[in-house]
Regions:
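Bacterial Sec-dependent N-terminal signal peptides
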Residues: 1-23
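Low-complexity, Ser/Thr/Pro/Gly-enriched N-terminal "stalk/linker" regions
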Residues: 21-88, 121-133, 170-171, 193-194
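Well-ordered alpha-helical scaffold segments within catalytic/enzyme domains
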Residues: 23, 64-79, 110-124, 156-169, ...
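Glycine- and aromatic-rich loop/turn segments at beta-sheet edges
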Residues: 35-58, 82-105, 135-151, 185-214, ...
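Sec/Tat-exported extracytoplasmic proteins
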Residues: 39, 43, 70, 74-77, ...
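Short, conserved alpha-helical segments within structured domains
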Residues: 58-65, 69, 104-110, 152-156, ...
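Extracytoplasmic mature domains of secreted/periplasmic and thylakoid-lumen proteins
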Residues: 94-96, 105-162
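Extended ligand-binding clefts on enzyme/binding-domain cores
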Residues: 150-151, 161-272, 279-290, 302-317
Length: 317
């Protein structure tokens, strides 16, 4: 899942001393180029369906996450081919959520985050009418209980936040936050363990469910998705916004918990506090945790002295 680290690589660019910065920047860009070139070569036509166990259209969530990374790479390495590749993909899918404009599955809404990135990059020259229709449809149901698994927070929440920033209409952000709070505090008495700073994946993993060693079950990748979502939503908000402050508290709490879970080799376990369950390093969570920590240090939320060693270990991993 190296494509998930593109955003992490971009975040690391500003985290070194001046003496080492150029060398590390070159290394990061080389890895980013190699990773992305592999992907764009292997999937040279971004409109073609994907196949992992079954055929799926190419605007599914796994591809959508790749384009999030590609947009981040473009910010530090503005190559026109990145935009051409993205626009060919978005044009083919008619700048619409996967499935239909009435789809409420967060996985199928994720692609809209990149549609909005391209809208901003082009000064409003891309059509977001289907994005608006999709978000409005879900909001019209008056339900905030769609995000029943924590991955959904990353797949959908930033889309509402981005659209709120583009349009200036607060209702989209309000809806996103109400949905987040439902997953956080209400579903199965809350999927976020405030005492431990980590998330259960869904209602099936909250206590009394336990790992074989008696510990709580916190999946690395799911917590990584939430961690990244907090970053992506906070990026759309001024620091004075009440929602920024709310999410910042969760971000700090998660950061402290994630730091404690890091393995000596720089990775994180599949099950964060139970190394025996699917034992061994887990790449997606590691990449997402590195991304979040790097962002937090860059923005003065996390102390460099506390997190630099962990980031260095994660990068080497």
């Amino acid at each position: 899942m190296k494509k998930l680290i593109l955003s992490s690589l971009c975040m690391l660019m500003g985290l070194t001393s001046m003496s080492a910065q150029t060398a590390l920047q070159n290394e990061i860009l080389e890895v980013a180029h190699r990773t992305n070139n592999y992907f764009m070569t292997k999937y040279s036509d971004p409109t073609l369906d994907t196949f992992v166990k079954k055929v799926r259209t190419s605007n599914l969530w796994t591809r959508a996450v790749y384009y999030e990374g590609l947009m981040a790479l473009y910010e530090i390495d503005p190559q026109q081919r990145y935009l051409d590749y993205t626009d060919k993909w978005a044009d083919y899918h008619k700048w619409t959520a996967r499935g239909s404009v009435n789809d409420t599955d967060a996985d199928n809404q994720c692609c809209q985050q990149t549609y909005m990135d391209r809208y901003v990059q082009t000064g409003g020259k891309k059509d977001l009418s289907k994005v608006k229709e999709n978000l409005d449809h879900q909001m019209s149901t008056k339900r905030v209980n769609y995000w029943t698994w924590i991955d959904a927070i990353q797949m959908a929440m930033p889309a509402y936040a981005k659209y709120a920033k583009i349009t200036g209409e607060r209702k989209y952000l309000d809806y996103a936050m109400n949905s987040y709070k439902w997953s956080r505090d209400t579903l199965a008495n809350g999927l976020f363990n405030k005492k431990e700073g980590l998330w259960w994946r869904d209602k099936d993993y909250v206590p009394p469910y336990k790992e074989k060693d008696g510990s709580n079950c916190y999946w690395s990748r799911g917590n990584g998705w939430v961690y990244a979502a907090l970053v992506r939503v906070m990026e759309t908000l001024p620091k004075t916004d009440k929602y920024y402050q709310y999410l910042k508290k969760d971000f700090i709490s998660m950061s402290q918990a994630i730091l404690k879970c890091q393995r000596e080799d720089g990775y994180w376990n599949v099950s964060l506090v139970c190394p025996a369950n699917y034992g061994g390093p887990e790449m997606t969570g590691t990449g997402l945790f590195l991304y979040g920590m790097a962002w937090g240090v860059q923005h003065g939320i996390l102390p460099r002295a506390t997190y630099q060693k962990a980031m260095d270990k994660a990068w080497k991993a």
